[in-house]
């Protein structure tokens, strides 16, 4: 969420910056609400001053033995008017808050301007795509040849965009997640966290998925079981399946003041992620690239504002190192203003090479959200007895497990349909060096 004081003082510049993101800021709505707010605020202050003055007159009149009934009646009327004005003021504040919750973050000044992915900027590449001396298969053909990826049965169980992984491929998927967790906790200084996969709406508002992207979420309604449950008007508890572990990890510091000496906080979690993929009809309908349920190892850093861009570069490096250890070619893309996520001020995408598609595909997205999420979550830090300040939050995939599996199946395939296990994963696979029939 943007700082409303910044909006009030620099509206034109902010409107221009948001337009670069493709967001048309409702200037007239904001100015109308601001005008009403100022008017009612002035009225409230005037009524409060008059009531205070009248209250003093009562004391003086009583000392002089005068009748105070008329003044008492005036105070009562002013009290009613004041209550009405306060209710109106609260209503306007709520509308302003709702408007703010719909506004995306401001792009950092280093972000290139662009309308869509065509405006993204390639930063660097690592590794050279392998030249195969046979016709490469995609991961679906490889998995089905091995009998270890089953979309048909998954569709019977759940519907489209689900899969069953079996045998060696299922074990490879598990090995990847374990390898990533070990690397991030043992080498990169992250603390592993096991998080709930169901979260309340406050969490999703904090990280920016709500209210704007509710259609992308899977929601669950159940009967209240505990007095701490968030019960709606029907007596039901509304929860959401997490679209990413960023949501529970970042919300660890919601409504919290973190002592300065504890920063940075670095969290990692391996979770399933659930997305409805609304608006993705017809995109990546084949294979594991775009599923309703997929696993991801998520990295979150909570930092001092002056350290967040240094942290972003290190976070990207942590995700890169996984691909380097797996010897998978990739490239780093700096996203343009029109292709960034709602909460991000700056985002790097890491794209891995998929030989069957002869292109690079996103496998990680690493973002600095600056104070945008922290303001929504009221996540702050404090040095000693100083006034609390907003934290900066960062997140990134380290990595998407399913897409890493896809990259290994395709980049490590052999002519006979088998798949070689990357050397670094062989200990996680119990010494298995190849998946074959």
Curated annotation (Swiss-Prot):
Positions bound to L-serine: 244-246, 298, 397
This protein's pathway: Aminoacyl-tRNA biosynthesis; selenocysteinyl-tRNA(Sec) biosynthesis; L-seryl-tRNA(Sec) from L-serine and tRNA(Sec): step 1/1
EC annotation from Swiss-Prot or TrEMBL: 6.1.1.11
GO biological process: selenocysteine biosynthetic process; seryl-tRNA aminoacylation
InterPro entries, per the entry: aa-tRNA-synt_IIb (IPR002314), aa-tRNA-synth_II (IPR006195), aa-tRNA-synth_II/BPL/LPL (IPR045864), Ser-tRNA-ligase_type_1 (IPR002317), Ser-tRNA-synth_1_N (IPR015866), SerRS_1_N_sf (IPR042103), SerRS_core (IPR033729), tRNA-bd_arm (IPR010978)
SUPFAM superfamilies: Class II aaRS and biotin synthetases, tRNA-binding arm
Catalytic activity, reaction form: tRNA(Ser) + L-serine + ATP = L-seryl-tRNA(Ser) + AMP + diphosphate + H(+); tRNA(Sec) + L-serine + ATP = L-seryl-tRNA(Sec) + AMP + diphosphate + H(+)
UniProt keyword Ribonucleoprotein, yes or no: no
Swiss-Prot/TrEMBL keywords: Aminoacyl-tRNA synthetase, ATP-binding, Cytoplasm, Ligase, Nucleotide-binding, Protein biosynthesis
Entry's transmembrane regions: none
Organism superkingdom: Bacteria
Family annotation (Gene3D superfamilies): Bira Bifunctional Protein, Domain 2 (3.30.930.10), Serine-tRNA synthetase, tRNA binding domain (1.10.287.40)
GO CC terms in record: cytoplasm
Annotated compartments: Cytoplasm
Major localization class: cytoplasm
Keyword Endoplasmic reticulum: no
Catalytic EC class: ligase
Molecular function in Gene Ontology: ATP binding; serine-tRNA ligase activity
Positions of ATP binding: 275-277, 362-365
Domain comment in the entry: Consists of two distinct domains, a catalytic core and a N-terminal extension that is involved in tRNA binding.
Quaternary structure note: Homodimer. The tRNA molecule binds across the dimer.
Role of this protein: Catalyzes the attachment of serine to tRNA(Ser). Is also able to aminoacylate tRNA(Sec) with serine, to form the misacylated tRNA L-seryl-tRNA(Sec), which will be further converted into selenocysteinyl-tRNA(Sec).
Similarity annotation: Belongs to the class-II aminoacyl-tRNA synthetase family. Type-1 seryl-tRNA synthetase subfamily.
This protein's name: Serine--tRNA ligase
Lineage, highest ranks first: Bacteria, Pseudomonadati, Pseudomonadota, Betaproteobacteria, Nitrosomonadales
């Amino acid at each position: 969420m943007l700082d409303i004081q910044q909006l009030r003082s620099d509206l034109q510049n902010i409107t221009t910056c948001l337009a670069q993101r493709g967001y048309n800021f409702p200037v007239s709505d904001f100015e109308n609400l601001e005008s009403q707010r100022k008017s009612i605020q002035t009225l409230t202050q005037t009524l409060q001053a008059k009531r205070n003055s009248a209250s003093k007159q009562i004391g003086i009149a009583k000392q002089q033995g005068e009748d105070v009934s008329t003044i008492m009646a005036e105070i009562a009327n002013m009290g009613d008017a004041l209550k009405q004005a306060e209710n109106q003021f609260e209503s306007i504040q709520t509308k302003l808050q709702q408007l703010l919750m719909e506004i995306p973050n401001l792009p950092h000044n280093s972000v290139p301007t662009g309308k869509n992915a065509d405006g993204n900027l390639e930063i660097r590449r690592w590794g050279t795509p392998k030249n195969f001396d046979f016709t490469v298969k995609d991961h679906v053909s490889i998995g089905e040849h091995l009998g270890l990826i089953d979309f048909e049965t998954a569709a019977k169980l759940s519907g489209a965009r689900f899969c069953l992984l079996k045998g060696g491929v299922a074990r490879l998927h598990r090995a990847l997640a374990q390898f990533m967790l070990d690397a991030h906790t043992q080498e990169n200084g992250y603390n592993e966290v096991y998080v709930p996969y169901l979260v309340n709406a406050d969490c999703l508002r904090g990280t920016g998925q709500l209210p704007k992207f509710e259609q992308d979420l899977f929601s669950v309604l159940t009967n209240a079981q505990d007095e701490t449950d968030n019960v709606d008007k029907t007596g039901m508890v509304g929860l959401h399946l997490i679209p990413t572990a960023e949501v529970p990890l970042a919300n660890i510091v919601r409504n919290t003041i973190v002592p300065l000496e504890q920063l940075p906080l670095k969290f990692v979690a391996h979770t399933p992620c659930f997305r409805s993929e609304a608006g993705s009809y017809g995109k990546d309908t084949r294979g594991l690239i775009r599923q309703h349920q997929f696993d991801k190892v998520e990295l979150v850093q909570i930092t001092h504002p002056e350290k967040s861009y240094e942290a972003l570069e290190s976070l990207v490096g942590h995700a890169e190192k996984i691909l380097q250890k797996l010897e998978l070619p990739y490239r780093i893309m700096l996203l343009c203003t029109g292709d960034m996520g709602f909460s991000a001020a700056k985002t790097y995408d890491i794209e891995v090479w998929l030989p069957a598609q002869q292109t690079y595909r996103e496998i990680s997205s690493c973002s600095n959200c600056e104070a945008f999420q922290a303001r929504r979550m009221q996540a702050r830090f404090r040095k000693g007895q100083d006034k609390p300040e907003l934290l900066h939050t960062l997140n990134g995939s380290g990595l998407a497990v399913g897409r890493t599996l896809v990259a290994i199946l395709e980049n490590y395939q052999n002519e006979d349909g088998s798949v070689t296990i990357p050397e670094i994963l062989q200990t996680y696979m119990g010494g298995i060096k190849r998946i074959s029939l």
